[in-house]
Amino acid sequence: MAATGYPVLILKEGTQRTYGREALRANILAARVLAEMLKSSLGPRGLDKMLVDAFGDITVTNDGATIVKEMEIQHPAAKLLVEVAKAQDAEVGDGTTSVVVLAGALLEKAEKLLDENLHPTIIIEGYTKAMEEALRLVDEAAVPVEVEDDSVLRRIAETTLASKFVGTGPERDKIISMVIDAIRTVAEKRPDGGYEVDLDYVKIEKKKGGSLLDSKLVRGIVLDKEVVHPAMPKRVENAKILVLDAPLEVQKPELTTKIRVTDIEKLESFLEEETRMLRDMVEKIAATGANVVITQKGIDEVAQHFLAKKGILAVRRVKRSDIEKVAKATGAKIVTSLRDLKPEYLGYAELVEERKVGEDKMVFIEGAKNPKSVTILLRGANDMLLDEAERNIKDALHGLRNILREPKIVGGGGAVEVELALKLKEFARTVGGKQQLAIEAYAEALETIPTVLAESAGMDALEALLKLRSLHSQGYKFAGVNVLEGKIEEDMTKINVYEPVLVKKQVIKSASEAAISILKIDDVIAAAPPKKKEKKGKTGEEEEEEGGGSKFEF
């Protein structure tokens, strides 16, 4: 096609494009900056981050998943890494900080190879081979454990909580005991010896007041609500529970309407009709044999009165997530309309009771039809402490779920990373060619984990790494960093520091895939932000300043 001499506009005005090595290096830098931010939070001696949102709310935590969720990341490559970390948290509930740190290290090593004019495709191929070999080696190094033994679960939970707010003292022991009891309750054994654990059966309810030592495990569901009417029973045994997703109120017309009453008798008949409709609703509920009503919507005051007269305990405006948990626990079917109500839709529990917890009242549903439903009722001095304790408990629950799903462990404290690095360097020599350089770089990146752990313990990181390499070359495959005592151990499993193999494999896989995804990008096309609407009284210069292209800062 002949050129016409006129400019050809492909992209919308204001669109910013970066391509080639410049785009790749910018993406690598963004990911490395994010990894550098999280690095100091890794391990038992990891430091906390204080996160302040746009409303001034403060979160203090060293939990990697919480940090990446709360941070407002702007650069697209860093956002990609954040999404990988979130996926790691959703998949196994642990190892989010490790994923980001390892991905950052892999990209740092890749950048050095790019400086040596190694093509990104070769680096990607080398990293892919290294990842596959690393996953095979982790399985090879893993040691089976007897998960029927509570002491094994306790040590896994201790390792998970070592870097957390509740990592020491009687509070830790209390939480670990509750978590083990909860997991044992909801776990179902598979024919292959592993377990299936549905954590949806474990509810965490927080109530300010008291201390963490006042927390307890309830075998049932706890609702942060109170009985709606003072005349209703506060305790119902052999409860037949109606779970509603519908209001016990007279429905208002969807259209705006006005009713003009010219006669007082007509007003009375109108009110009587409303009362009759509400009475009929309650009669229909009572006819099924229900003696407890739990609804997501509201309950009219007149309906409350009739329910109380029937001796029915009622709770209103319960969260959707709690409604689903109650239905699952009691075997009830969520009813969306009273027209569909049948006795077989009711759930069952041995006891529904309102109890005072601190200064508030809560409703306890115990002895549910499904015995696998439990609630961890957390107590604490303030909301910040309770939020962090909740995050810690979720981490411990996921850690135990992972070891039950695949009952194998590897040494903690960076032991498995050093072992993998040693074996991958040997593997690289068998591959040869330029891919050998990429596999060796991958191996060096793995050593970032023990290096960071050693730094957090106040040790000389280089000296610690050299000693670990020496021990692993002598056959000590679980030699690692004892962060709490600031020394190198020949076998981390002997001091009860180990990790579920499922988590370790997912960390390697997620970090590798994140790094490879970023290395595949050679063109970044960012659309211009939408221009603000022109405001009256603005000068032309001010209007001009509102436009412009995209800009990424990190």
Curated annotation (Swiss-Prot):
MF annotations from Gene Ontology: ATP binding; ATP hydrolysis activity; ATP-dependent protein folding chaperone; unfolded protein binding
Domain of life, per lineage: Archaea
Transmembrane segment boundaries: none
Annotated keywords: ATP-binding, Chaperone, Nucleotide-binding
Residue segments, region Disordered: 530-554
NCBIfam families given in the database record: thermosome_alpha, thermosome_arch, thermosome_beta
Role played: Molecular chaperone; binds unfolded polypeptides in vitro, and has a weak ATPase activity.
Family label: Belongs to the TCP-1 chaperonin family.
Record's protein name: Thermosome subunit alpha
Protein species of origin: Aeropyrum pernix (strain ATCC 700893 / DSM 11879 / JCM 9820 / NBRC 100138 / K1)
